């Protein structure tokens, strides 16, 4: 597990809990009276056996895409048994540049993705496309390398003009790798992610709320799948 993000993530977690509660109220409005009392949102079930792999495609350190990924991880950590972050910049450059499929480090990445239930892909957007560093790794995955996995795309860029790169550049490649369950992505501009003096990052309110909503929906959807059965009503309402 990664180190605790700290106080900067506390607001994200609170927004996450509010979004989870609101999502359940919208989904089952007729089954409970308005004044019914429900379990606290903090009672979310731990998703036993859910492995998560994060692919960070930023060539820079530190980076805002890493900060966005860190916040997503902090929301998911209570609901996963393992989260691994693969920083593509730390993989052997020669293996990436020369497309060495048999390199041990690349083979290890493929194995970790194969064991994952959820794959998070985080990248900066350069010239209306995801990073070339990320592309060099995706090219070394098998054609069905993301089949059967839920994928959450995250991206950062200099301006709102790059927002469409998430939909028209990154998501089609993920689909070409077999991903059929691609969550709504989160895109944030540099102005929406503040870099703090201690190296952490703080999201603005809109980005924080969107990330909390999307991650909350993922937890709600994946928890019953991993448990192998529908959650009891009291736990479903805790979501």
Annotate each language-model stretch with its function:
Residues 2-10, 17-30, 34-37:
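Low-acidity, Ser/Thr- and Arg-rich intrinsically disordered low-complexity segments
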Residues 24, 45-46:
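Short, positively charged and aromatic/hydrophobic N-terminal segments
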Residues 50-79:
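N-terminal beta1-alpha1 ligand-phosphate binding loop
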Residues 56, 87, 185-187:
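Residue-level recognition of beta-strand->loop/alpha-helix junctions
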Residues 57-59, 88, 156-157:
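Cofactor-binding loop segments of dinucleotide-utilizing enzymes, especially the Rossmann-like FAD-
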Residues 85-104, 194-198:
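N-terminal beta-loop-helix "entrance" segment that forms/cooperates
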Residues 101, 105-178:
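Helix-loop-strand module that forms the ligand-binding subsite of alpha/beta enzymes
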Residues 182-239:
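Glycine-rich phosphate/pyrophosphate-binding loop and the adjoining helix
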